[in-house]
Amino acid sequence: MEAERRSQPGKPKKGRVCSNLLLERHPAAGTLTTMVDSSAPPSRKLPSAGVGRPRFSPQGGQRSRPHSRRRHRTTFSAVQLEQLESAFGRNQYPDIWARESLARDTGLSEARIQVWFQNRRAKQRKQERSLLQPLAHLSPATFSGFLPESPAGPYSYTTPPPPVTCFPHPYSHAFPSQPSTGSTFALPHQSEDWYPTLHPAPAGHLPCPPPPPMLPLSLEPSKSWN
């Protein structure tokens, strides 16, 4: 067996490679072999898949992003805008027949007119919100300062006063009435300002007017005593 193995010096052993270079440089190291698995396929580094590189289509051209649809803006003339604004003032939501009739008058397509009405309604809502936004911060007391004060309006309601009870004058029965004579002098009417201070009336009640002034006694000359 050993003779057969020696007779085939040029046939390397499977899975093992002898390193003669190390033996020549280091003879004292003895027989030194390195184990190399030659049956395993050589490893290769896979390239990174598309990192930082543009992608190419199978046809060979570079793949481009799908560009967005370009919007075409329609320019309206002054006559067309006047007709559209007039129709918008009459009806903000025209039907298909009204839009087709307006399209014949203005020379525009029905789709353009429909888009114009949508934009016009959105513009009007935005204007209304901008007008109402400053008024939302004002308090109700601020609004009352701008309103004119009227003494009595057609819808103003006032509370009726309490019923007035009339009390007799406290001095109306204190003095008996005396007959009037021809030679009497009428006293001037006294001021009634003193009456509420001397005789305050209860709350919700007013006193009766004072009685007529009493006539003084007769000023005839006294008869002599005979």
Curated annotation (Swiss-Prot):
Ranges annotated as DNA-binding: 69-128
Q: What is this protein called?
A: Homeobox protein prophet of Pit-1
Q: Look up and give the organism this protein is from.
A: Alouatta belzebul
Keywords of the record, alphabetical order, are: DNA-binding, Homeobox, Nucleus
* Record-level GO cellular component terms: nucleus; transcription regulator complex
Question: Which GO molecular function annotations are given, in alphabetical order?
Answer: DNA-binding transcription factor activity, RNA polymerase II-specific; RNA polymerase II cis-regulatory region sequence-specific DNA binding
Q: Where is the composition biased (Low complexity)?
A: 216-226
Query: According to the lineage, what is the superkingdom?
Result: Eukaryota
Map out region (Disordered) in residue numbers.
29-73, 178-226
Keyword Thylakoid included in the entry's annotation:
no
Pfam families tied to this protein: Homeodomain
Which family is this protein grouped under? Belongs to the paired homeobox family.
Instruction: Describe the task this protein carries out.
Output: Possibly involved in the ontogenesis of pituitary gonadotropes, as well as somatotropes, lactotropes and caudomedial thyrotropes.
Question: Which residues fall in a compositionally biased region of kind Polar residues?
Answer: 31-41
GO BP terms: namely: pituitary gland development
Q: Which gene encodes it?
A: PROP1
Compositionally biased tracts (Basic residues): 64-73
Stored Gene3D superfamilies: Homeodomain-like
Q: What is the lineage of its organism?
A: Eukaryota, Metazoa, Chordata, Craniata, Vertebrata
Kindly list the places in or outside the cell where this protein is found, as annotated in its UniProt entry: Nucleus
